[in-house]
Design a protein with these regions (language model features):
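Active-site beta-loop-alpha junctions enriched in small/polar residues
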Residues: 7-8, 38-43, 161-163
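Conserved aromatic-histidine-acidic binding/catalytic patches
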Residues: 4, 8, 133
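Active-site-adjacent beta->alpha loops and helix N-cap segments on the catalytic face
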Residues: 7-25, 164-169
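Hydrophobic anchor at the start of a short beta-strand
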Residues: 35, 155-156
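Conserved beta-strand positions in the central sheet of alpha/beta enzyme cores
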Residues: 3-4, 157
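Structural motif
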Residues: 151-153
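An alpha-helical appendage that flanks or caps ligand/catalytic pockets
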Residues: 18-147
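C-terminal/domain-terminus segments
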Residues: 146, 158-169
């Protein structure tokens, strides 16, 4: 099986399957390969903005962890950052470049999956939150989860920010 980043749609889950099946042994079967997506899942109140203070507080740490990961992938392997971070990428890389290279790896993951440090709050955009977290009304979440399940996602592991975790879970 696999624990993976949250696939934002059923189509994305199908792309994940295509990658897994490409070089898989002949006996590989979706039915026997368990998939789990790691994300923060938040039930949005009617009319609430995706980037509301409450949503940022409850799932911002997960969104920022994905930005940390994108930076590491870019820095270590030259991978293109995802479109969801395009609007903040230049400012984010500038912020991190201010830290000495020999200590930067420690700074990159500060607060990782627990909280968002104050100077990184500015990078919690609507686009980043939508791309990395499962946010919606109860009906929207049910619809999205059903579509992902039909595409072969078996489980969602909900990892909210540390401080509000008991309220969220």
């Amino acid at each position: 099986g696999a624990v993976m980043a949250f696939p934002g749609s059923a189509a994305m889950m199908e792309n994940i399957w295509a990658m897994l099946e490409k070089d898989a042994p002949a006996e590989f079967s979706r039915d026997s390969f368990y998939t789990t997506a790691l994300t923060a899942m938040i039930v949005k109140e009617e009319g609430e903005a995706i980037d509301s203070p409450r949503i940022k507080h409850e799932c911002g740490a997960m969104a920022m962890a994905s930005l940390h990961y994108a930076y590491d992938q870019w820095r270590n392997f030259g991978y293109q950052p995802p479109n969801a971070v395009a609007s903040v990428w230049e400012d984010y890389t500038k912020l991190l470049s201010a830290f000495p290279e020999e200590r930067r790896h420690q700074r990159i993951h500060l607060g990782h999956n627990c909280w968002v440090i104050p100077e990184e709050q500015q990078f919690l955009t609507k686009e980043l939150l939508q791309a990395t977290c499962l946010i919606g009304t109860q009906e929207e979440l049910i619809e999205k989860l059903r579509a992902l399940n039909e595409a072969g996602l078996n489980q969602v592991m909900n990892l909210p920010s540390f401080d509000p975790r008991f309220d969220v879970l």
